[in-house]
Swiss-Prot record:
Its EC number is 1.-.-.-. This is Cytochrome P450 monooxygenase phmB. GO terms for cellular component: membrane. Belongs to the cytochrome P450 family. It is an enzyme of class 1 (oxidoreductase). The chain crosses the membrane at residues 107-127.
Amino acid sequence: MAFPGVRRGLGELIGLRKSDAWYSTEDPRFGLTCRITASTRKLASCTSPWQYADIIQFIASTTITTIMLESLIEQWQIMRQAFAPMRLSRWQLVKLLAAQIHRDNPVAAKIAALLFVAGLFWAVSVLTRPKRLDKKLGLPLIGGSRTLKKDFATVIERGRQMYPDQPFIVNSSGKPFVVYPPSNFDEIKRLSEEEASAQDFFYDATHGYWTSVGTETPALWKTIGIDLARAGAPVVSTKQKDARTAFDRYVGYCPDEKSFNVFDVMMKVVALTNGASFVGREVAGGRWHELVAQLPMTVYFAVIFLTWTPRLFRPFLEPLFFLPHFKVQRDMRRILEPIIKQDLDEWSKTDDKKEQLKVKEGQRLPYHKWLISRYGPGEATPRQLATDQIVTAFESTISTALTIYYILFQLASRPELQDELRQEIADNTTDGQLPSTSLTELRKMDSVMRESFRVNPFALFSLYRITRKPLQLSTGPKLPAGTIFCVDVHHINNSSALFPAPTRYDPHRFLNKREQPGAEHRHQFVSTGPMDPNFGDGTQACPGRFWANNTIKVCLVHVLTRYRLKLKEGHTRPQPVCMPNGSWVPDLKAEVIFQSLD
């Protein structure tokens, strides 16, 4: 059905010509240009009244806008004429006009003010937005400029297929990352902190201004990498007792099958076991270990919410999102205050400093005294020592708990592997007591841990860095200062050239590798290198991996000698989800069934 009369009327009303694609009519007084996106062809093709209604609605809205602007300009001219003798400035006239509009139509004035503020924020956001890194560097952008996908691993796989030996850019939680291929691993690990800093990256990623993560001092770094690593062997016996206390508290005796939330239990067990070494059993057994278990979650939830927040609003919302973290930190500092005061007093009043630095059986580690000995005069303040202790708790808890989490699910699905490890434990213990060593004797267990870490790493990337000055690598363009870059280790952990059948979990994979000539000390859980990329490598590799290795083995020994594990009926091992920042997040609700062996 056609409506020729209506078509002609509309055409005459808006002044269309048959050849026009864009039309403009100008008001002779104010020069107001009204662009109407229509054409005679579109009008001619209208066969439905609804299409005509849309056109009429557009014309009406344009006409109303024009009338409103005419009225506003008319009021402005009247005010200028009326107040001309007073010689008011334009800004004063604008304020008078705004006051008049507010009196005449307060609702419209408020809406206009809100729209103005929103428009101002949008304009500032656009004007201050940095130039896209892919255009600046000339590198391909994979996954789009606003990658917020749960299947982030597929983005990386697609990028590596398209550019197997070249760097590309991904947008990781709103920030551009230059992702280098595995072939650049050795080159990047050799970079000094003055060239590219891992600490700067973690400070940026976890909002270190609010969380203190990434503020590790050289004294703290050396304390963890040297003093704490050496303390692993002497505290094995003590840590076994602490692990027993933790499991008795959160798992207990299970004559019948009983399921537990693995992530929740392991966070508390690790926090309590490690806490006994750092702050003492009595303090750790109180509220301390609960706060330590909460600490990482308060950081990660705040970071996730800020990722979803428009960049312009983040400075205003950061304090709000980190309020739970502030409360946890405040409570932890209050608990630490008397402990640190005692350690500072003992250090200042005793002449034999070396004696105070020794690890003593059944006592908490002299952790604060190690730190004091490495700080310069006046640097080891109570606040600094408390910050170091909190950062240590943050970094040593969730990574260790997650590693045990994944291992327990592998064991629960393999009863024969549990029996095999129990036999190895029996061969290396006396009355259930582990030797006071670094526990390298548990080679099968170490292989199980290393393979689990390969299959379930913390992230798709490693060797995270932020450039501190312009940097030219052997591949790709020159990176300006402040650029985030990393190495794609997803394609190292899943390389069929390095690991035959990489998608299969082989608990003996690294045990077999270590049996090859010259490789008996390689391929361990704590190893670093191009085949062992998850802890990083070089001078900026994770310094706490030796302490974590000790804690994990002690906890696994306790579980395997006390419990039988199995998956819930009809359930399979939970699959982690790859988040838009490249990290793998486990199923936080997954459960495993525990049953006591006797």
